[in-house]
Amino acid sequence: SKSIGGACIGVFSYYLSSPFNLLLLLFDKSQLVLFVHVIITLKLACAAATFAFYLNRRFEEWNDGSVKKQALIIFLAVSYAVSQYGIAQACNIMWLDGFYMLPLIMLGVYRVVNGGRPVMLSVSVALAVLFNWYMGGINCVFACFWFLFEFAYSRLYSGDTKAEKTVIKILPENLDGLYIQCWREF
């Protein structure tokens, strides 16, 4: 049997390790309902912000300063945040951490596929797992599928035949984020 709080590590890492939970210190006990509403709003706003960041970096050709294109990015980012998943999971605010981390993981995959540095992918996966290990794991599974999409899309338009290098590179970088989180098991 676990003692000295050992059983609490699983509870903490599943329910409580979101950085937004630190905001609870700013609220009185009587304002708990307000706190939950603020957290939901902040997490959905963070989802919109990370998706806008993803769109700006992934589709750099959109960054010509055009008001129409920036309005489209804002529209798509807000649409992502208030999608059915985002609204439905407002009842389970712990799932929203993976929701706002997903665009950063997608951008990390894009950068690795296109020969960029893998730091963003590793750090994003590590943070997603840190914030909620279950959704972080789901995000890792999605990252594998997203890699296949980005890889196929990239090779379709570039005609690059040196695919093995990218395939060999993506798996360790995705796993690095998981390895960073191994401290929880000790």
Listing of model-derived features with the role each one plays in the protein:
Residues 56-68, 112-116, 156-167:
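Membrane-interface helix-boundary motifs at transmembrane edges
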